[in-house]
Amino acid sequence: MALQVQQTSAAFTISSPSTAAARIKLSPFRTVAVNRGVRCSGGGVGGGDAGKKKAVPNSNYVVPIDKFSSSSSITRPLIEILRDLNKKIPDNIVKSHDPPSTSAATSGFIPWYHANRMLSFYAPGWCGEVRDVIFSENGNVTVVYRLTIRGSDGEAHRESTGTVTTTDDHIEDPVTAAEEIAFCRACARFGLGLYLYHE
C-alpha cells in the first residue's frame, strides 16, 4: 500500500513511578518517537522474494519529516511541483523487472516506497486513495487509484489502474500488488518516472 506515513517526536511527562528502577527507566521529559499514519505493506510485485527484507539504497533526496507534516505549510505552486516531479530519477532508485518483462513497454520501474518518499519530498500534502477494487471472473484483480497533489494555487489529481492475476504464486497479496502498480502509474501520470515507460 502506498500512502503517506508521517513521524513526529513528542515529549511526555510521566507522573512519579512507584519504584526507583521505574523512575530511572521512565524519567520525565524523555523524548519518545511516535509513529502515526497508515500501515504500508509491500506485497511483492517483482519476484519470489516477497518475504525477504531488502536494504533501501542511499539516494540523493531526503524526506523532511516534521517541516511539512501539516498541509498549511504548502507554499509552492503546482507548476513547480510538476516540474520537479518530471526530473530524472537517480539510477540507483530505478529497479529492473525480476523476471524480464515480455513487453518492451517499460525498461524499469520505481518501487512504490521510493515513489512515496519522492512525492513527500516534492509534493508535501499529497493524498492517495483506492477508488475501486474489481475482481474479474478470469482470476484478475484490478485496483483503481487516485493521486491528488496540492499546491498553493490549487490541486490536481490523476487516476490509474493496476491489474494482477490472483493465481500468481509469487504474489502474496494480489490487491496490494495491484495497488502498488496503480500508485506508480498514477505517479507517472504526474511525470514521476514517466520516461521509464518510453525507453
Curated annotation (Swiss-Prot):
<comment type="function">
    <text>Involved in double-stranded DNA break repair.</text>
</comment>
<feature type="transit peptide" description="Chloroplast">
    <location>
        <begin position="1"/>
        <end position="40"/>
    </location>
</feature>
<protein>
    <recommendedName>
        <fullName>DNA repair RAD52-like protein 2, chloroplastic</fullName>
    </recommendedName>
</protein>
<comment type="similarity">
    <text>Belongs to the RAD52 family.</text>
</comment>
<keyword id="KW-0238">DNA-binding</keyword>
<keyword id="KW-0234">DNA repair</keyword>
<keyword id="KW-0233">DNA recombination</keyword>
<keyword id="KW-0150">Chloroplast</keyword>
<feature type="modified residue" description="N-acetylserine">
    <location>
        <position position="41"/>
    </location>
</feature>
<dbReference type="GO" id="GO:0000724">
    <property type="term" value="P:double-strand break repair via homologous recombination"/>
</dbReference>
<dbReference type="GO" id="GO:0009536">
    <property type="term" value="C:plastid"/>
</dbReference>
<dbReference type="InterPro" id="IPR037489">
    <property type="entry name" value="RAD52-like"/>
</dbReference>
<keyword id="KW-0227">DNA damage</keyword>
<dbReference type="GO" id="GO:0003677">
    <property type="term" value="F:DNA binding"/>
</dbReference>
<dbReference type="GO" id="GO:0009507">
    <property type="term" value="C:chloroplast"/>
</dbReference>
<keyword id="KW-0809">Transit peptide</keyword>
<keyword id="KW-0007">Acetylation</keyword>
<keyword id="KW-0934">Plastid</keyword>
